[in-house]
């Protein structure tokens, strides 16, 4: 039996802040939360720092990028997942869905997707694992190879992932994230050193190629729709831009609208009973990098159920600080957006709140104005581990 406590903390509970809180943990489960509660034999003094649930991230693309720090460099996947884990754990993330793209396009291949998923499952059962690793299966809506591989992968993974999270994504210019193709053209100009004319021609070519495989989207939908209806998958509609997009997603039996690009789409998602996920980097910056609706606006309108890191893990805690500083949220409300909100969205019921009986994934941190510093991270089903900062080294 392992029992310890975190004393003298500022505990962020679901609807309130509890000062001078003692949180007692036994065998990875919270067994008591009390103001000025007694310390156990083993304890950590938080010295007034914030104690909050571990962050739950429903969409992170970071692991896919970790093995490729330079265009000509390829790192081993077993090293890469531990390297990336260290980064996200230092950002206070304790449960993470790795976005793995099933498609044959550019740097993404079906072969690499399967290799990524293999190492995630393998490392998850390692005695050295330091967080809860899960998979977000991302399907390019128009890629037949990706669809066939994803179907086979999901069936083979049933024992380790009974109800996988699947995102159905169509990044064809002129819809979704790049409904205004000018933003994609600007991105191509900056990232590939093209002129405006070259970027326009490049996007034109993408449209021709994507239109040629449009039929693959219709071939994938019956299987996805059936699997979602049977409860075999949790289906995300990615980048819905209009109420019509949301209405279509409802016919797929999607339950999540991920990254709605307009207020109207988010309102339609709420009216249809879909959970809504926004990007933490968007909330941190106060605006979308591709000209779409601000996550802060959706949060202020009550149209966001949770944030995900997308491409920047530390943005989760950064968004908490920013949302509180600019008055969009109270601290408990902002914390909910990166903990219980995402948990509820993806169907995880045993964590995400500081409550007796729940999994003791816990983060101790401070905010200097709106800028976070993580002092300690604990995860359930493992020995209590904390950063050197918490040990006073």
Positions of PLM-derived features:
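Glycine-enriched alpha-helix->loop->beta-strand junction motifs that scaffold or abut catalytic
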Residues: 158-163, 249-256, 271-277, 302-305
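Metal-coordinating catalytic core of metallo-dependent amide/deamination hydrolases
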Residues: 102-107, 111-240, 310
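Hydrophobic faces of well-ordered beta-strands that scaffold small-molecule active sites
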Residues: 54-58, 96-98, 133-137, 164-170, ...
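C-terminal cap of metal-dependent C-N hydrolases
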Residues: 9, 27-30, 340, 356-393
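Metal-associated gating/positioning segment near the N- to mid-region
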Residues: 46-118
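A general structural motif
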Residues: 215-217, 237-239, 257-266, 285-292
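N-terminal metal-binding scaffold of metallo-dependent hydrolase/deaminase domains
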Residues: 1-39
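His/Asp/Glu-enriched, well-ordered alpha-helical/loop segment
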Residues: 230, 272-282, 286-365
């Amino acid at each position: 039996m392992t029992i310890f406590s975190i004393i003298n903390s500022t505990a962020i509970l679901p609807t309130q802040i509890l000062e001078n809180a003692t949180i007692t943990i036994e065998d990875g489960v919270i067994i008591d939360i009390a103001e000025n509660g007694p310390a156990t034999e083993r304890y950590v003094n938080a010295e007034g720092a914030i104690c909050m649930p571990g962050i739950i991230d429903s969409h992170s693309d970071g692991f896919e990028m970790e093995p490729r720090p330079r265009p000509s460099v390829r790192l081993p996947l077993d090293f890469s997942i531990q390297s990336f884990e260290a980064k996200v754990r230092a950002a206070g993330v304790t449960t993470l869905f790795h976005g793995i793209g099933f498609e044959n396009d550019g740097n993404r291949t079906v072969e690499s997707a399967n290799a990524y998923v293999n190492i995630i499952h393998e490392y998850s059962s390692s005695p050295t694992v330091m967080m809860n690793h899960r998979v977000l299966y991302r399907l390019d809506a128009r890629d037949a190879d990706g669809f066939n591989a994803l179907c086979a992968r999901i069936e083979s993974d049933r024992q380790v992932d009974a109800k996988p999270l699947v995102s159905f994504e169509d990044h064809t210019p002129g819809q979704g994230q790049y409904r205004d193709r000018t933003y994609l053209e600007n991105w191509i100009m900056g990232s590939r050193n093209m002129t405006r004319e070259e970027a326009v021609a490049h996007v034109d070519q993408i449209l021709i190629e994507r239109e040629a495989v449009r039929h693959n989207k219709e071939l994938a939908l019956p299987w996805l729709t059936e699997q979602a209806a049977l409860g075999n998958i949790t289906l995300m509609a990615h980048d819905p831009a209009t109420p019509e997009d949301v209405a279509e997603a409802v016919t797929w039996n999607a339950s999540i609208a991920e990254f709605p690009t307009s207020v109207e789409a988010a309102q339609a998602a709420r009216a249809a009973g879909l959970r809504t996920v926004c990007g933490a980097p968007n909330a941190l910056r106060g605006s979308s990098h591709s000209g779409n609706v601000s996550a802060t606006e959706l949060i202020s309108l009550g149209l966001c159920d949770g944030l995900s890191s997308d491409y920047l893990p530390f943005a989760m805690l950064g968004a908490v600080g920013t949302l509180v500083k600019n008055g969009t949220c109270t601290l408990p409300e902002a914390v909910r957006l990166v903990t219980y909100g995402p948990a509820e969205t993806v169907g995880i019921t045993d964590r995400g709140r500081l409550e007796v009986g729940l999994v003791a994934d816990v983060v101790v941190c401070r905010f200097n104005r709106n800028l976070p510093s993580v002092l300690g991270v604990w995860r359930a089903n493992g020995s209590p581990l904390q950063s050197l900062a918490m040990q006073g080294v």
